[in-house]
């Protein structure tokens, strides 16, 4: 096991970049239980959360530690508008974290991002309020591209192609 007594945090990117691998809810429950017992933080990179192909309906959300979280859990979830809403390069996102981390996270953000331009902030509001159709279209287009590539790779001798359950990588 990679966890040792000195482990302070576990970083999980699911759906994963670049494989599209997705950590299932059962495994998330086991990891969360272990982290609770040992006081280990979970840093969840949820950038591809809504680009998930295995759930019910188009653009279903991937399993998330936030779905399992209790108020006192040590979970930090990061997310971005870049992937889901196709706003790559605009550097707009959000963090879900326990309230006691807010002052330190505020300092980190202040020193790394001096100011997100107002037009990008407004675009983010529109994306959240009106962007479900974009998400559904994007997820469907990516799923079809994955299926297309998967079918062609399976025809090649000696190639075993595993379908990615999420993200934007075939």
Regions found by a protein language model. Give the residues of each.
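Conserved N-terminal phosphate-binding loop of PLP-dependent enzymes in the Aspartate aminotransferase
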Residues: 108, 140-141, 152-154
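Short amphipathic alpha-helical/adjacent loop interface patches that line ligand
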Residues: 28, 109, 139, 146
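Active-site pre-lysine segment of PLP-dependent enzymes
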Residues: 1-9, 18-41, 48-87, 100
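Conserved glycine-rich beta-strand-loop-beta hairpin in the small C-terminal domain of fold type I
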Residues: 125, 141-150, 160-170
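Short beta-strand-to-turn element immediately C-terminal to the catalytic PLP-Schiff-base lysine
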Residues: 67-68, 92-99, 129
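Active-site C-terminal subdomain of aminotransferase-like
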Residues: 70, 100-119
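Structural motif of enzymes handling amino- and sulfur-group chemistry
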Residues: 99, 116-138
